[in-house]
């Protein structure tokens, strides 16, 4: 596997299964001001990332919780804020986790700081990729690179699907394996479902940003109905509604 990345030109890349880094030309950066009700979560992430960039003590991070609540978007916000200080992001998919050793070897001595971003990370019973991740988070004989952190997102607190095998001793072995993976993330930040107020606040931001806030009051009930149909009041659903509104499709639904 031969990896290439022009770090000065590209702020982020995605590892492709065929064995190369796809450098990202366009990134949809997000400002921290756009997040609603996540002040504590943002403060924790920024403090850890600032410590990382300053060569101070820092830790790998697991962002877990409700879908569509901004976990992945926060990584883009971090990159937008800290790219000028040498931060770069490499995204890797679950099925490619076995390539982490080669990726570490490639990045270890580069004059940048890297967040390895694992999005929507969770494992079912028969999947074994988590063992590679568990080893390299803590357990390898080789020291973890000082210029790399892993930030992962998941809908599951413990990453592995809960199950008990009849061959386990009272089921404890499976639980221990499951918990051992999440334990390797010293900082676990939980994200919870938005309520009515937060949902409308996110939507209001969208209208303000597009200079059409005067239209917001007339559309709130439709927005609430849409969230009910989707079964969620997350920021993702609010932004989906806004796109439908702008396209005129919301009047047809």
For the regions a protein language model found, what residue spans apply to each?
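A short, basic N-terminal segment
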Residues: 1-51, 235, 239-253
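C-terminal alpha-helical "lid" subdomain
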Residues: 2-9, 192-253
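A conserved segment at the C-terminal end of the G1
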Residues: 76-80
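AAA+/P-loop NTPase substrate/partner-engagement loops
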Residues: 81-114, 121-126
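Conserved nucleotide-binding/hydrolysis micro-motifs of P-loop NTPases
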Residues: 95-98, 121-124, 150, 154-160, ...
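Conserved catalytic/switch belt of AAA+ P-loop NTPases
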Residues: 125-166
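Conserved AAA+ ATPase "SRH/arginine-finger" region at the nucleotide-binding site
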Residues: 169-179, 186-200
């Amino acid at each position: 596997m031969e990896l290439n990345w022009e770090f000065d030109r590209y702020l982020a890349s995605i590892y492709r299964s065929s064995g190369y880094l796809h450098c990202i030309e366009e990134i949809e950066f997000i400002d921290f001001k756009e997040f609603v009700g996540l002040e504590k979560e943002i403060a924790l992430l920024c403090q850890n990332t600032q410590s990382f960039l300053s060569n101070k003590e820092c830790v790998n991070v697991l962002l877990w919780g409700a879908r569509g609540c901004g976990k992945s978007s926060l990584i883009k916000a971090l990159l937008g804020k800290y790219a000028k200080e040498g931060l770069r992001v490499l995204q890797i998919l679950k099925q490619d986790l076995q390539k982490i050793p080669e990726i570490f070897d490639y990045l270890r001595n580069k004059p940048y700081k890297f967040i390895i971003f694992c999005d929507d990370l969770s494992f079912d019973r028969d999947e074994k990729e988590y063992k590679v991740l568990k080893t390299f988070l803590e357990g390898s004989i080789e020291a973890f690179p000082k210029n790399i952190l892993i930030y992962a997102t998941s809908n599951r607190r413990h990453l592995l699907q809960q199950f008990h095998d009849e061959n386990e001793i009272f089921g404890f072995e499976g639980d221990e394996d499951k918990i051992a993976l999440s334990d390797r993330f010293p900082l676990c930040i939980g994200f919870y479902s938005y309520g009515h107020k937060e949902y409308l606040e996110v939507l209001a931001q969208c209208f303000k940003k597009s200079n059409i806030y005067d239209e917001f009051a007339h559309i709130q009930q439709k927005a609430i109905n849409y969230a009910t149909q989707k079964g969620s009041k997350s920021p993702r659903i609010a932004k989906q509604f806004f796109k439908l509104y702008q396209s005129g499709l919301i009047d047809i639904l």
